[in-house]
Regions:
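Phosphate-group recognition and catalysis centered on beta-loop-alpha active-site segments
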Residues: 1-226
């Protein structure tokens, strides 16, 4: 079963130190989020505002990377760029959550000339995912919320023929609705769509999910799953 470390957790969130530790522990699949600074540098960050991690009330897209670098994460760690992550771990599989429209534009610029085999891209914005598919049809992408709903309502025939380049990264449930159903698993298997479930932090749950036939899990606590 494939284990994705969620933002490098349980290490310091979205830092190079966290991903280095995960790699040393044998994790080869990284899940992260990106935002673009005002000068187009892609940094690993879940929130658009840096207050939670730095105590400073600033929006990433409104400041240059040089200025962002002056605000340490947790008072200790450097901001990690997508460049740094990829350069440090060229063999890692990296799932990238694109957090904003300006970030999407910067990501397209960043991706030019790069090999795309080790990247998978997702977003809660179906519009962004559709834009990625249009520009890079061979780049693996996550199912959009619309596509997940089509599967759950047995309208999966409306999902286009490029679904083999996609993967499903889903919770077991969302807002009281069961997502990981037998129907969902069956359709994904028929369409050769791998399923990864988030966020799974116990070995018992991971084992139960594996028995259902999923490909792997996204976790905040990979050591308990090794």
């Amino acid at each position: 079963m494939i284990i994705w470390t969620h933002r490098g957790n349980p290490g310091p969130e979205n830092t190079l130190d966290a991903f280095k530790q995960a790699w040393e522990d044998g994790i080869r699949h990284f899940e992260t989020d990106i935002h673009a600074t005002s000068d187009g540098v892609l940094v690993l960050a879940h929130d658009s505002n840096i207050r939670r991690l730095t105590g400073v009330d600033l929006e990433i897209q409104e400041i240059a990377f040089k200025d962002l670098s002056n605000e340490s994460l947790y008072g200790i760690y450097k901001w990690c760029t997508l460049d740094e992550l990829v350069d440090a771990f060229p063999a890692a599989q990296i799932s990238i959550d694109i957090k904003s429209d300006p970030t999407l534009d910067a990501f397209f610029q960043w991706l030019k000339g790069r090999k795309i085999e080790n990247f998978v891209v997702g977003s809660f914005s179906s519009k962004r995912v559709d834009a990625v598919r249009k520009r890079y049809p061979l780049l693996r992408t996550a199912l959009t919320s619309r596509e997940v709903l089509l599967i759950l309502t047995r309208m999966h025939f409306l999902i286009d023929s490029h679904s083999a380049n996609r993967f499903a990264m889903i919770p077991v449930k969302s807002h009281g609705l069961r997502i990981l159903t037998k129907q969902f698993i069956k359709v994904c298997k028929n369409k050769k769509i791998e399923i990864f479930v988030w966020t799974v932090n116990s070995l018992d749950e991971a084992i139960s999910l594996k028995q259902l036939g999923i490909s792997g899990v996204v976790t905040d606590n990979y050591p308990v799953l090794l």
